[in-house]
Amino acid sequence: MLITLQSISFSQRKNEEFKYFIKRSPGQIIIDGKEDVNWSTAQTATDFTMVLPMDTSKAKVRTEVKMFYDTAGLYLIAINYIDHGQKFMVESLKRDFSFGKNDNFLLFMDPFNDQTNGFTFGSNAAGAQWDGLLYEGGKADLNWDNKWNSAVKYYEDKWIWEAYIPFKTIRYKNGITIWGIQFSRLDISKAEKSSWAPVPRQFPTASLAYTGILVWDQPPPDAGQNISLIPYVLTGLSKNYTANTATKFRNDVGLDAKVAVTSSLNLDLSIHPDFSQVEVDRQVTNLDRFELFFPERRQFFIENGDQFNNFGYSTIRPFFSRRIGLNAPIQYGARLSGKLNKNWRMGFMNMQTERVINTKTPIQNYTAFAIQRKVFARSNIGLLFVNRDQLLGKDEKDPSYSANPFNRNIGLEYNLASSNNLWTGKYMVLKSFSKNTSGDDFTHAGNIQYSSKKWLIGYQQESVGKQYTAEVGYVPRKDYFKISPSISRIFFSKNPKITSHTIKVMNFDYFTRKLKLTDNTTYLAYTLTLRNQATYTAWVAHDYIKLLQPFDPTNYTKDTLARGTQHRWNSVGFELASKPQQLLTYLISGRFGGYYFKDRKSTRLNSSHEWISRMPSSA
């Protein structure tokens, strides 16, 4: 199957006829949201194509984009035309706002033209900035924040976004004069999403498989020396007057540094880092049998972090950076990552944590190495090695002794992405190494997905060994075999108020390694999507679980169910999402039915409301 699919990836690149020829700015440009005279000599990218609600016509709203560059960075101006006096829809002034709840304009860049990795910048109509890293062909990591400048100005018939992006902010290879480029606009009042280079409606406008081409009149200037130093000093004192203890003093000193080894290869250094400014996790009540996953938000781990953190699947991660530095302070860390050339990416990281006497946590050293090779049009093969070593405490008399002095993982992964993005998938194998553990320590998993306008068909299977151990990873469940097919069919409507009807069927089956069923979920859903982007969903589901460990489904009543007990229940539910054009938007969902206990029913209603600001245009 893979050989057949790969023949697709040799086909002609999509949208290569959409070319933007960028040239040097004829003069200084002030970033103020005004279209000054210098912009008159730049090429204009216009005639956007509608993506949603339908991708079969030109956009109804007019957008014009122009670009320049100078010795230090890129200039961009986006002129977003509206009806005379039309108000702008804005939900938040927060950086990296919610895409679907704000009128916005976004830029997607692929400096290596590999259709896999890139950068995104943009703004909503109120001027809130958006920036992130693109990976896996079009997924965006918005935890990445960097330095650049932008401004928004309002007019009666348009709003203008102007930006300047320094070359030091992005990563690119010197000498490459062909980049991937895409412009995207969302106008909520018109219920329209559009893009410069056409994108099929089933894909996000961030899809790097459908970018146009940015053609430089000469190779982009060298970014020059790029070194950032962030030192910190943290002092304080504390005293327990009740216990009358001595005053404790705190004096912490640390340093973070970022060094551009080349324009595409970056070195991050950290000594006694301080993560007190990192955004806190969203609070979640865990009613599941397994550990929850929270995303990495520490900037040290973000850039090119997909090479490490995205290896595998959401529940099979051989490396999870949040395992490092949360239960023991970090002494130091170094990370070298980036592009070697168009086809090769690499990442190397080494970190060491301090010894914690109270918890008997020894000094730990962590190493991760990843390398990735592009193959065919957009696919790649990746290798990952992860190592944790205990540096002290090998003597059993030492209070920090650990029975597991080391843990290692090595894995190989193939990521499939056809040139038109219709076929995607991956296959990976992993093996772990630990003291006094051998046999049944392999893991393998694979999936394949087909995404067309009318069909979304997928299949995934996983097999995790009983002895497989990823101490620096996230693998909440072991010793199982899983299969998960799914299929969705979209029926487009000729009714002017309805976009589509969607029927979706999913099934999840977990087995023991001897193929005895332990978990099953069968799910059927119907979704009605209106032209104004409101959606209404109704679903039914059947669940079966055989508990492998004692479990309290309520997490607080101590009604613990015994290991080996079997539980079946049926449930129904709904979800109502209002049209985003309303001043007060809502999302209401409900679930009714069984849940573990035969003599009890579960009813859950959730409701969230948001106020969307309508900002009047002004001259």
Label the model's feature ranges.
Residues 91, 134-136, 194-196, 241-246, ...:
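Outer-membrane beta-barrel translocator domains and adjoining extracellular loop/strand segments
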Residues 64, 104-106, 160, 228, ...:
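Membrane-embedded beta-strand positions in outer-membrane beta-barrel channels/transporters
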Residues 222-268, 366-434, 495, 500-505, ...:
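Surface-exposed extracellular loop regions of Gram-negative outer-membrane beta-barrel proteins
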Residues 1-17:
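Bacterial Sec-dependent N-terminal signal peptides
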Residues 329-331, 337, 405-406, 420-604, ...:
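Exposed, low-structure sequence patches enriched in small/polar residues
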Residues 83, 186-188, 236-238, 274-278, ...:
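Structural signature of outer-membrane beta-barrel domains
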Residues 12-374, 379-383:
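Structural preference for beta-rich elements and adjacent junctions enriched in aromatics
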Residues 53-55, 151, 217-219, 241-245, ...:
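Outer-membrane beta-barrel proteins
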